[in-house]
Amino acid sequence: MIMDGKFGKYGGIFVPELLIPALEELERAFLHYRDDRKFMAELEYHLREYAGKPTGLYYARNLSEKLGCRVYLKREDMLHTGAHKINNTIGQALLARYMGKTRIIAETGAGQHGIATAAAGALFGMDVDIYMGTEDVERQKLNVFRMEVSGAEVIPVDSGSRTLKDAINEAMRDWISNVDDTHYLIGSTMGPHPYPTMVKHFQSVIGREAREQILEVEGELPDTVIACVGGGSNAIGIFSAFMDDDVELIGAEGGGEGIESGNHGATLSAGSEGILHGSLSYVLQDGDGQISEAHSVSAGLDYPGVGPEHAHLMDTGRARYEPVTDTEALRGFRLLSRYEGIMPALESAHAIACLERYAEKPENRGKTVIVNLSGRGDKDMFMVAGLLGVGV
């Protein structure tokens, strides 16, 4: 490998020997094409004309008046397919095509990465297979249909907790058997090197846009940036543009039923160092080192690991991470819907709930905050209605 793929002590490569050549091939291609004018011009074209970049930075006037902060929403929810995931899937699918691959496989939890992968596969004429835990298939039936309509085959995974962790396991098994013609399109800043670095690269467009936009409207950088964190790609994407500045970075994790309950997905808040899906980071595990099941009302946040750069940012104190319970996230969903008429994905609702908590502190009154609205809530409407006791 050309790079060591480390963020401090985190990251690296912990995979079967059979996958090392594929990872080396991927690293070489990524490092070459990220500096290739033709590749980058094609990527920028598809992000602009197909995905809908750049997205807006919306001043949420009503919410700002309600909370006492100047709140800006980075509107990644306005992208084609409904979330930030398309930034990465177009980038990786285009890279795979340049590498001569004809098939893409992916994992998905909430379904947004699966939809974005299916869309990218259709765009570039590639076969797509999506692994999805049966628990998530049940929670996200509409997204399953959207993937299938776009030409992807959705493969339910009934092992383990039947969620994202298990979908990743099956996707990795597939890749080991089909490395010659298949690219594994990982959806977050996790997994073995070069994935955390590569996904960050493709998602950093969020932060570059947000930085330019806030400077244009405010004339200065924000005090704080808030984003939800599962694997961590939307958060690292927006954090990346502010890491070298005096800007507070806050990640909102899936707190589930509360840390004390043990039924949560708050890996950084309550986990410990361990190896999961090819890299060293924080994981949820028992005393014997067995990976624990994660829980969140949001299918995109119930992952028992987290991207290695987030682990490094927490350890160094550059970013802090807070658990947000299911109840708080639901309140965040209702808050943004009521005051701005914008229904966030349940993942993004965790960031809104974190914002509400932030605004309650007297020292934060009047501060300027950017919240990354990573996805829209269409996919979650039936679940939210059920949680609110409303029949639809």
From Swiss-Prot:
Sorted alphabetically, which PROSITE patterns does this protein's record hold? TRP_SYNTHASE_BETA
What EC number is given for this enzyme?
A: 4.2.1.20
Query: Mind listing the GO molecular function terms for this protein?
Result: tryptophan synthase activity
Which cysteines link up through disulfide bonds? none
Q: In which pathway does it act?
A: Amino-acid biosynthesis; L-tryptophan biosynthesis; L-tryptophan from chorismate: step 5/5
Functional summary from the UniProt entry? The beta subunit is responsible for the synthesis of L-tryptophan from indole and L-serine.
Q: Which family does it belong to?
A: Belongs to the TrpB family.
Designated name of the protein: Tryptophan synthase beta chain 1
What species is this protein from? Methanothermobacter thermautotrophicus (strain ATCC 29096 / DSM 1053 / JCM 10044 / NBRC 100330 / Delta H)
Q: What is the lineage of its organism?
A: Archaea, Methanobacteriati, Methanobacteriota, Methanomada group, Methanobacteria
